[in-house]
């Protein structure tokens, strides 16, 4: 998923192309997927990120750029994808193949949402704009999911590699400390 506007990032660069540690975030995510057991990578840019589409060297499914959920729905409706589908946000510069493989190993069918404790995000010093209660804990989605057919499940981890989403310049500084 690489079509966001990145308004909270407050930069001229398209969010997926924003450099963390000198490398565009989307390149870091594609690299993590290539280093994992994922067998096919398809990007989902939008009109909000035209330079991202031309930058990528993987097949793309154009999305409408109307927000994460609408873009995800558009991507999943494309005939080139079949479920289950691993979805990953382009703003996870610490992601690596090992973490991706752990997510895949945790998927037991249906859909899987990867969550982190909101307290972990706060402890790391990164933004936690979206939180909710799950099983008596306040958690935050990571931007990593498996979308399948069947029951929904959640996987809670304390792994900073999925906890650090870059939404602000301050988040980028935190990410760079862990590279």
Protein language model features and the residues they cover:
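Conserved core of the sugar-phosphate nucleotidyltransferase
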Residues: 55, 95-179
């Amino acid at each position: 998923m690489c079509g966001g506007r990145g308004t909270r990032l407050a930069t001229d660069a398209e969010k997926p192309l924003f450099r963390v540690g000198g490398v565009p975030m989307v390149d870091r995510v594609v690299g993590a997927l290539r280093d994992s057991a994922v067998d096919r990578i398809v990007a989902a840019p939008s009109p909000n990120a035209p330079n991202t589409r031309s930058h990528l060297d993987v097949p793309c499914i154009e999305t409408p750029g109307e927000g994460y959920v609408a873009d995800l729905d558009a991507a999943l409706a494309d005939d080139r994808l079949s479920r289950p589908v691993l979805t990953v946000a382009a703003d996870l510069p610490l992601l690596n193949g090992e973490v991706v493989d752990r997510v895949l190993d945790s998927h037991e069918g249906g859909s899987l949402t990867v969550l982190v404790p909101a307290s972990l995000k706060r402890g790391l010093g990164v933004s936690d704009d979206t939180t909710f209660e799950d099983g008596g804990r306040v958690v935050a989605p990571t931007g990593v999911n498996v979308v399948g057919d069947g029951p929904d499940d959640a996987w809670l981890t304390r792994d900073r590699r999925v906890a650090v989403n870059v939404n602000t310049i301050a988040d980028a500084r935190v990410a760079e400390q862990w590279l």
